[in-house]
């Protein structure tokens, strides 16, 4: 069953088309990430789902109930949708307990029990209840914002780049905790982000947005290993794209003959490998390697190697894990793991 269905959503500001025929389904209890560069339309789409913006056309269904189709519109406060903005947007004049309890109905004791349960749910120490927002860390503020959104028992949770202001280590830990919490609460969620690794690690379903359109929607691993086109491939991570000649499930390219993911394709094509699919080893000094390192850019854990292939003279640039012995002039071997992906067309 789908919690959310979008059919043909479009939006323009004056003569500028921001969204073009967006179709998307979000399964009950699942996590979806909408990822794209700045200006791709992802925040506009989130605001339309929330009810803050009205689309020019299309239909939104929330648990089968029509939210709007351009002529009629259910306002944001009647949709039962939780929203966590980028900065948390906590009420500065309310304590942690006041923020979480804002909008809760019932008597004082009942509200207190609910606030304590929500704080426990988002792993906030009860001793923080009397603190003010400015006394909290960034991660704690985001947990308070999430607890406040969950207090209304939403049918859908929208997260607008909620981790972007956090430090790198805290961002990963908070993201993991929020994902686990939403799964336990069985609340479907949509995360909007420009961070590819964040989208891939958070979601069950990733939607890549480009120029107001959804370029590809699917499981994170499918999009990463089998992107629909070269722009999507490079947006989701480092790539090595090669021209090749295909025949019977194999490709002849600058790396030699390697397996590909479509045995039916033949003739010229462009193929893609991810850097982690290429194992680079140092050759025996007495033997000639498959390639020679002509340049290296060391960046700590990862180094970028400029290679010249011995057999063809082709120049390649490949990222690999840094290690001793990788230096200009060194002879190396290359071993391709798995299959290369063939781009359509």
From Swiss-Prot:
GO terms for cellular component: ATP-binding cassette (ABC) transporter complex. One of its GO terms (molecular function) is ATP binding. Residues 4-236 form the ABC transporter domain. It is found in: Cell inner membrane. The keyword Phosphoprotein does not apply. Keywords: ATP-binding, Cell inner membrane, Cell membrane, Ion transport, Iron, Iron transport, Membrane, Nucleotide-binding, Translocase, Transport. It catalyses: Fe(3+)(out) + ATP + H2O = Fe(3+)(in) + ADP + phosphate + H(+). It is a peripheral membrane protein. ATP binds at residues 36-43. It is an enzyme of class 7 (translocase). The complex is composed of two ATP-binding proteins (FbpC), two transmembrane proteins (FbpB) and a solute-binding protein (FbpA). Belongs to the ABC transporter superfamily. Fe(3+) ion importer (TC 3.A.1.10) family. This is Fe(3+) ions import ATP-binding protein FbpC.
């Amino acid at each position: 069953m789908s919690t959310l269905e979008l059919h043909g959503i479009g939006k323009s500001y004056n003569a500028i088309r921001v969204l073009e025929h967006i179709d998307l389904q979000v399964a009950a209890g699942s996590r979806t990430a909408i990822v794209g560069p700045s200006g791709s339309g992802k925040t506009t789409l989130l605001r339309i789902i929330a009810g803050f913006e009205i689309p020019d056309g299309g239909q939104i269904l929330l648990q089968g109930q029509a939210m709007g189709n351009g002529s009629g519109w259910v306002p944001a406060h009647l949709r039962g949708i939780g929203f966590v903005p980028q900065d948390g947007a906590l009420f500065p004049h309310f304590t942690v307990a006041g923020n979480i309890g804002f909008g809760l109905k019932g008597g004082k004791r009942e509200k207190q029990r609910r606030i304590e349960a929500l704080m426990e749910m988002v792993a906030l120490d009860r001793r923080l209840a009397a603190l003010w927002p400015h006394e909290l860390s960034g991660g704690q503020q985001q947990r308070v914002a999430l607890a406040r959104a969950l207090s209304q028992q939403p049918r859908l949770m929208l997260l607008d780049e909620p981790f972007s202001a956090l430090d790198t280590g805290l961002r990963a830990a908070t993201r993991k905790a929020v994902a686990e919490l939403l799964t336990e609460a069985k609340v479907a969620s949509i995360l909007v982000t420009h961070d590819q690794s964040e989208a891939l690690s958070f979601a069950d379903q990733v939607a890549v947005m480009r120029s107001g359109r959804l370029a590809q929607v699917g499981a994170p691993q499918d999009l990463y290993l089998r992107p629909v086109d070269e722009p999507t491939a490079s947006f989701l991570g480092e790539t090595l794209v090669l021209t090749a000649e295909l025949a019977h499930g194999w490709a002849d390219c600058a790396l030699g003959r390697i397996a590909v993911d479509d045995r039916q394709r033949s003739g010229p094509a462009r193929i893609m490998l991810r850097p982690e699919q290429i194992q680079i080893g140092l050759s025996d000094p007495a033997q000639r390697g498959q390639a020679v390192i002509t340049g290296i850019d060391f960046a700590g854990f990862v180094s970028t190697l400029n290679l010249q292939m011995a057999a063809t003279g082709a120049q390649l640039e490949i990222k690999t894990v840094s290690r001793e012995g990788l230096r200009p002039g060194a002879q190396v071997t290359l071993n391709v793991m798995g299959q290369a992906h063939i781009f359509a067309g």
